[in-house]
């Protein structure tokens, strides 16, 4: 099995000065890298991830307990400032997924458990915050 690239290598490859448009082939790769490096592979099942133009947000985590197939869904914007911003947003939504799936919290909020991942994000050169501009 081929080795996956590290997040640092991908950030360097795409750079911080060009726009990044995610696609459905790259997202699972970045998801696996973040899952391994931040969550120690605890997020076994990847939720459904949608890409669409959004107003007022760059990402969104949704939970629907009544859904038959996909009760967890991450929606991300279709265009980002750069690859780093995309990785931060995907990681941010993965923290909400972790809160719901692993910690079994009723609401995936920006609380103490959410910010407990800040050091892990910083180690990867990413920023974990409540609002991204």
Which residues does each PLM region occupy?
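Active-site-proximal or metal-binding-adjacent scaffold patches in catalytic folds
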Residues: 1-88, 97-133
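Walker B catalytic acidic pair
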Residues: 93
């Amino acid at each position: 099995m081929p080795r996956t690239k590290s997040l640092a290598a991908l950030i360097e490859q795409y750079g911080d000065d060009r726009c990044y448009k995610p696609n459905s082939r790259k997202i699972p790769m970045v998801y696996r890298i973040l899952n391994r490096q931040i969550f120690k592979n605890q997020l076994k099942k990847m939720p459904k991830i949608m890409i669409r133009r959004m107003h007022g947000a760059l990402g969104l985590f949704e939970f629907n307990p009544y859904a038959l197939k996909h009760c967890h869904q991450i929606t991300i914007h279709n265009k980002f400032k750069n690859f780093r911003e995309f990785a931060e947003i995907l990681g941010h939504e993965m923290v909400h997924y972790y809160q719901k799936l692993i910690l079994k919290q009723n609401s995936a909020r920006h609380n103490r458990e959410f910010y407990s991942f800040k050091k892990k994000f910083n180690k990867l050169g990413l920023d974990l915050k409540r609002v991204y501009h």
